[in-house]
Amino acid sequence: MQDTLAVILAGGMGSRLSPLTDDRAKPAVPFGGKYRIIDFTLTNCLHSGLRRILVLTQYKSHSLHKHLRNGWSIFNPELGEFITVVPPQMRKGGKWYEGTADALFHNMWLLARSDAKYVVVLSGDHIYRMDYAAMLEEHISKNATLTIACMQVPRHEASAFGVMAIDDDSRITCFVEKPADPPCIPNRPDHSLASMGIYIFNMDVLKKALTEDAEIEQSSHDFGKDVIPKLIATGSVFAYSFCSGKGRVARDCYWRDVGTIDSFYDANMDLLQPVPPMNLYQKNWAIRTYEQQYPPARTVSSATGNEGIFINSIIANGVINSGGSVQHSIISSNVRINDSALIVDSILFDDVEVGEGCKLIHCIIDKHVKIPPYTEIGLNPIEDRKRFHISERGVVVVPESYQFSTE
């Protein structure tokens, strides 16, 4: 796909995912015991044959840059392949990106330099698997100028998305960004057709649309709010069904925006279902990431004779469970679990130590936290709220490197 450029938007603040995003960009947030969120979009590019990639970063990007350098420096420049991380260049004035379209407009020089005919615009903060090659093939076959990936969502949730209407040929006839009263799908009044934020543009159309949008002072410079509605009138904008079953990836129709603590928690817990709604085990679509070379996880007996137990959990390398019990949880690399500790319905990031007799229920523990013996988290909301963030649905989040009081 030498005529196609992938651009991944990875610069959002991710404030709704705080405190997990207090010191890192949302695409760099750990997920599923060993991955980062951006790994899913990058893996899709890799397996789809997209080997020319720009990653546009902005806020708190150090952790993301480090991960991309360590884990994704796999492309061969001699074959025209690259993954280039692009922080704001301030080429269009001394200001940060003001919207999704503005991010690309500020980097128009890189788009032009690529000599690409098509541009695949992606978000770096969604969890899903998709063969972009199949979408590009349909884009070309329909002679489209813009193709938007879409999926059906319950109408009561559709206000969080761009919503579209299509004709019998999948041509988009109407597009509204985050409408208060979302239009429904004909013959299915309880569902709407939502944009996934995945776009394929013809390069010439994209450059013209970005230039025109940049000249409008009152524009918010956003694809969904400003650019796409204007292009609909051309009659050559089409929808691509995410659940069409096309392409090499297994048809699981799983796509999640993990922009809040609750949605992030739910997506992790989805991996623990007896038959997970997203299949991470498809051999020819393995999710790539970077991970340090830790030894295998193990369980050992404690000094009191308790055996370390894992039940229906995901356990990363380097974990040692010395007489604790882990149930329906995700344990990331290099975690230490001590005697009689109980961990249930929880997510632990790297380098956490759980002290003897601790009880962790329905919580997320960020990196580099040492939990003192007999600490209880997730059992008393009143006490937890004094120290930690609690989500709308009661998930307790302990921030990175949190220091417990020794009093």
UniProtKB/Swiss-Prot annotation:
Gene3D superfamilies: Hexapeptide repeat proteins, Spore Coat Polysaccharide Biosynthesis Protein SpsA, Chain A
CDD domains: ADP_Glucose_PP, LbH_G1P_AT_C
Catalysed reactions, as listed in the record: alpha-D-glucose 1-phosphate + ATP + H(+) = ADP-alpha-D-glucose + diphosphate
InterPro entries: ADP-Glc_PPase, ADP_Glu_pyroP_CS, GlgC_bac, GlmU/GlgC-like_hexapep, NTP_transferase_dom, Nucleotide-diphossugar_trans, Trimer_LpxA-like_sf
PANTHER family per UniProt: GLUCOSE-1-PHOSPHATE ADENYLYLTRANSFERASE (PTHR43523:SF2), GLUCOSE-1-PHOSPHATE ADENYLYLTRANSFERASE-RELATED (PTHR43523)
HAMAP family xref list: GlgC (MF_00624)
Protein name, per record: Glucose-1-phosphate adenylyltransferase 2
Gene source species: Vibrio cholerae serotype O1 (strain ATCC 39315 / El Tor Inaba N16961)
Lineage: Bacteria, Pseudomonadati, Pseudomonadota, Gammaproteobacteria, Vibrionales
Gene designation: glgC2
